Amino acid sequence: MELFKEMSTQHEEFHYLIKLYEHLDLVAHIPVRNIGTVAGNLMTKHRVPTFSSDIFLLFETIRATLIIVHKGSSVEVTPEQFLSLDMTGRVITHVKIPPLSQRYQFVSFKIMARAQNAHAQVNAAFLYEFDDHHKDVVLSARIVIGGLSGKFVHARETEEFVCKKKIFTNQVLQQALKILEGELIVEEIAGEMKPEYRKKCALGLFYKGLLVLIPQQQLKPWYRSGARDLRKTRPLSKGSQVYDTNPITWPVNEPMPKIEALIQCAGEAFYSNDTVTQPREVFCAFV
């Protein structure tokens, strides 16, 4: 992640890596990221296609490729091709991240149940290539959405539709939303939100991605808040509760330390788990 942050400032063609850094900062938390690996995350996606892998999402969107070694040979595949590859006896050794010119605009989102240390309910990433002379005309598009099903990766019909069109016009937007709604494959996933919610969320992220990219002068003021990143604009929330006691009623509700408090704080308390395992020991639990 630090390499992404450094490269984004030193090399213009990797300017977009700062956005990957910001997205990866939402993945798990620091201790998990320190012991986890990129290849391990991708292999989880390979084994569990419904897993909403942020790393897979980002790499597939930016056209990254994976170098996979098998015995004396190696093969270079896209993340999507990797999902259908038999990985028995194979190892991911490299990830190639391509440079992108200033014509490309990248934006990504991760919808989580909590602000940190939570997997994505729905995640989405968009990469648009715009014409140098007509800034609102899309030359190519990559629309990747995760968390919907194990079968859906690219919104290919929508990608083809927006090419050579002025994507910031309402007519094109409405048609693109209809096409996207028709091609999304959403399935029931155990432990995840209902398919109806995840489908609406995916459509909303497509719209929000365009709000982020559209020049502000072309956007009506009441729509601008839709592009706002609340994590960056809202201050941290905080709260406190104070429980008062009335000395007149003491010793009822009088604050006092419990008997074991000092030895517990000092680490001197002896618990059942501290005892040595005995022969024929039986474990039980109250249910």
PLM feature spans:
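Short acidic-hydrophobic catalytic motif
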Residues: 242-279, 285
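Short, well-ordered beta-strand elements within core beta-sheets of diverse protein domains
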Residues: 160-161, 283-287
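C-terminal structural segment of proteins
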Residues: 1-252, 258-261
